[in-house]
């Protein structure tokens, strides 16, 4: 009788755990910044993983210091209202949009430019437009001039120009600050738009050598920069696990080829 009672209690506990997990997947796992992290670097790595600095440690530190909006914050559109598919958002970056043209590639350029501007390297801020012409920032330390430069840049640059300007990187060498990017012209078929997302953090398991990474993106129409949620992870973690030998990756809902990883 005691054995039957123990089995019953065990089955009851398993059922309660299953129900709790189901409720969490349906509700808790879609909550933005569920643990109220203050900045991107507060997001814990997968168990056994350690953050890496990459070839540009200062850029890695800058990205990890990006402030996050509080628990439950929604991705808002520049024009007002909230974006669709909020479940794709793991955490909203607390950085006000500059214009309705600040979309996917623009976000990648902005984060790079913000890093250089905040580091006092204003002379290093330059990007190419869709015709291959270099657009240089020449406004010095003026924040107003810097933001005006970015607004103008958004109108002449795109996923096409960014994919041509950045240098290719092997998946195995992925680092913070890298960009997954493709232009519509590179994809025959129904693809009307290109897309770009930035790798904002990378962690490595020293025992296995495996890597995981965080992504941040903007999108069309212009919306808050946000850390992407990995929908393939059963716990809805924002970390994407890297398969170095993969020919392609599905990052949230966007497909990328292995050779579409780039770096500044």
Residues covered by each model-derived region:
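N-terminal hydrophobic targeting/anchoring segments and the immediately downstream early-domain regions
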Residues: 86-90
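Extracellular-facing segments of soluble proteins and assemblies that are Gly/Ser/Thr-biased and enriched
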Residues: 93-173
């Amino acid at each position: 009788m005691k054995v039957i009672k123990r089995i019953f209690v065990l089955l009851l506990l398993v059922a309660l755990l299953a129900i709790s997990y189901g409720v969490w997947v349906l509700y808790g796992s879609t909550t933005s910044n569920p643990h109220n992290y203050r900045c991107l670097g507060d997001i814990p790595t997968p168990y056994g993983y350690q953050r890496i600095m990459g070839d540009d440690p200062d850029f890695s530190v800058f990205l990890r210091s990006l402030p996050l909006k509080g628990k439950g914050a929604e991705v808002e559109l520049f024009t007002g209202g909230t974006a669709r598919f909020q479940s794709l958002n793991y955490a909203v970056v607390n950085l006000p949009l500059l214009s309705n043209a600040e979309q996917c590639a623009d976000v990648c350029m902005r984060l790079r430019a913000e890093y250089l501007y905040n580091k006092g390297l204003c002379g290093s801020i330059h990007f190419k437009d869709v015709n291959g012409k270099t657009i240089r920032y020449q406004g010095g330390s003026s924040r107003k001039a810097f933001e005006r430069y970015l607004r103008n840049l958004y109108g002449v640059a795109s996923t096409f120009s960014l994919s041509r300007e950045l240098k290719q990187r092997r998946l195995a060498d992925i680092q913070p600050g890298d960009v997954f990017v493709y232009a519509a012209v590179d994809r025959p078929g129904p693809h009307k738009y290109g897309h770009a997302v930035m790798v904002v953090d990378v962690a490595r398991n020293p025992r296995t050598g495996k890597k995981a990474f965080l992504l941040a993106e903007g999108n069309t129409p212009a919306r808050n920069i946000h850390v992407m949620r990995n929908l393939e992870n059963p716990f809805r973690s924002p970390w994407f696990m890297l398969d170095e030998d993969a020919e392609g990756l599905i990052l949230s809902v966007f497909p990328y080829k292995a050779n579409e990883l780039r770096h500044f």
